[in-house]
Design a protein with these regions (language model features):
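Histidine-centered catalytic micro-motifs
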Residues: 21-33, 199-202
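Short loop/turn segments at strand-loop or loop-helix junctions that form parts
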Residues: 57-64, 131-136, 199-202, 239-243
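Mid-to-C-terminal alpha-helical segments outside catalytic/metal-binding sites
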Residues: 1-22, 26, 38-46, 54-55, ...
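Catalytic pocket-lining loop regions of alpha/beta-barrel enzymes
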Residues: 149-284
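Alpha-helical scaffold segments that flank or form the walls of functional sites
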Residues: 33-95
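Active-site metal-binding loops of divalent metal-dependent hydrolases
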Residues: 28, 134, 202, 288-289
Length: 337
């Protein structure tokens, strides 16, 4: 099956539109699971395909957990695993993994401080924050996120105490949720304003199950929620996730992988609305690889982002924020060595 996917992707070949524009990719995963491997060699095959990707940020995916010890401390194994991968990336000459976003159960409340301190120690200067995904929908056709969250997790008092602890300790929160839940993040951002937060993947605009072929109705829900969220200055947005099949745009059903023109045409309105709502200084283009590899290649994805920027007429300074600057500021990523 992997060979079929590789052949499907390889059928669409593009050169970078701008091979010099610096990119800090603020969202990718790494894993070594029975179903597949995506480690530094695979990451560098993608980031080194033509665009100028200098640094990256790893985001949790339940990889490398400890298999023994207290349950709440086991996710620290992922930080240790990625720290080792980061060292390999620094030695191998490609994009350097320069920050780590891990998992901790924020419903531990104030007691999550122990887990955060352990992540920070394990990261050896790379740990930046936590993603505790809350993506949930009442439809049995929509699979919830890997954390198996209950509905309305962001309103849980214990969760909010853990979320506040993140900010108090100087760490950030990555929010992964569906479009129907973004309003819950608005409430959380209002109630606990001191924790920096980045909303992943354009706010999760679903396009399958009960949301299939209802894109305008989904927009009518998510866009006002994004506009309300943008009023909270501690909130930033990741612009990406657009290759995921749950968004229902049908890339996987094409006879060959889409071109950057196709990807840009499919997503330009939504991406430009997000950027215009938050401003380029609070938006960052992300790959979400290898998950988004189900939809297009890395080069096609970043060509699509560059096409959208060209179409919108963003200035050099605005583009610098979108492709690198916002990610550097939010995740406190210094310049490459």
């Amino acid at each position: 099956m992997a060979d079929d996917k590789d052949a499907w992707l390889a059928a669409t070949v593009e050169q970078p539109i701008d091979a010099d524009e610096e990119i800090v990719d603020p969202h990718h995963h790494l894993w070594d699971f029975p179903a597949g491997t995506y480690l530094v060699p695979e990451l560098h095959e993608d980031t080194g395909a033509g665009h100028n990707v200098t640094q990256t940020v790893f985001v949790e995916c339940a990889a490398g957990y400890h298999t023994s010890g207290p349950e709440h401390m086991r996710p620290v194994g992922e930080t240790e695993f990625v720290r080792e991968q980061a060292a390999i990336s620094a030695e191998s000459g490609g994009a350097t993994i320069s920050a780590i976003v891990s998992f901790a159960d924020l419903t531990l409340g104030n007691a999550v401080e122990e887990v955060l301190a352990a992540h920070d120690a394990a990261g050896e200067g790379l740990f930046r924050g936590i993603r505790h995904a809350n993506a949930w929908d009442g439809s049995d056709q929509i699979r919830e996120s890997h954390t198996k969250p209950p509905p309305e997790l962001l309103a849980d008092p214990d969760f909010r105490a853990g979320y506040a602890t993140l900010g108090r300790m100087g760490f950030s929160f990555d929010g992964w949720m569906f479009h129907t839940q973004v309003a819950e993040l608005v409430d959380l951002a209002h109630a606990v304003p001191d924790t920096p937060v980045v909303l992943d993947h354009l706010g999760g605009p679903l396009g399958i199950g009960p949301y299939a072929d209802r894109r305008d109705e989904v927009r009518a829900v998510v866009r006002p929620a994004l506009e309300a969220l943008a009023r909270h200055p501690q909130v930033t947005v990741k612009v990406g996730g657009i290759g995921m099949s749950i968004y229902g745009v049908g890339f996987k059903r094409l006879p060959q992988a889409p071109s950057s023109e196709h990807v840009a045409a499919t997503w330009s309105d939504d991406i430009r609305h997000c950027i215009e709502t938050f401003g380029p200084d609070r938006c960052m283009f992300e790959s979400n690889f290898p998950v988004d590899k189900q939809g297009c290649s890395y080069t096609v994805l970043f060509n699509a982002f560059q096409r959208i920027c060209d179409e919108a007429g963003y200035t050099a300074a605005e583009r610098a924020d979108l492709f690198a600057g916002t990610a550097r500021r939010f995740y406190r990523v210094g310049p490459p060595a």
